[in-house]
Amino acid sequence: MFVLKSASPRRKQILFDLGFDLKIDPEHIDESQKELESPLEYLERMVHSKLGTLFEPNNVYLAADTIVVYQNQILHKPIDTNDAFRILKILSGKNHSVFSGAALRHPNGTEYFYEETMIGFQNWNDFEINEYIKRSKPFDKAGSYGIQDKEGPVLQWIGSYTNVMGFPLRSFLSRHELWIGSWEERIMRRD
């Protein structure tokens, strides 16, 4: 069985669209950043924490996390409307990076991987930022935005679209030998 250790609706949808039969079993963890912890150190620690310690040999476990980084600082999920405005104002008209990391736990061990996507934002005024927040309610999204949002702030990107949605799909697919059995099992049951 394939166990997704995440409550993210976007990760769930990406994997469902690929044909996975998922068991959703998120870990509830402290997502506080440690003092002097770099963004990539934080990302890896979060992914491994979300993976948890449970392991059943017939299962493949997947955990993931996404961070938005500007000037080597993580812009976390906003806590309220004012925080979302603050974050979007910082990013307006500028470039930043989105990192999504994931870990697969399988019978032979655990493998961690991540991807980076470069994002260029539109230069929005205060009114445009407030309208976007009202329209999109980006409170569950790192960086206060979704690349998939209509009339959103993303002007351009270099890298993976699904990475910005919260899942490093290219890296995941390149490790197909780790999860192909779970996927084939699902396909066989459909026939």
UniProtKB/Swiss-Prot annotation:
InterPro entries: ITPase-like_fam (IPR029001), Maf-like (IPR003697)
Residues carrying the site annotation Important for substrate specificity: R10, T66, Q148
Chief location bin: cytoplasm
Locations listed in the record: Cytoplasm
The keyword Hydrolase is assigned to this record: yes
One GO term of the biological process aspect: nucleotide metabolic process
Protein's name according to its UniProt entry: dTTP/UTP pyrophosphatase
Organism of this sequence: Leptospira biflexa serovar Patoc (strain Patoc 1 / ATCC 23582 / Paris)
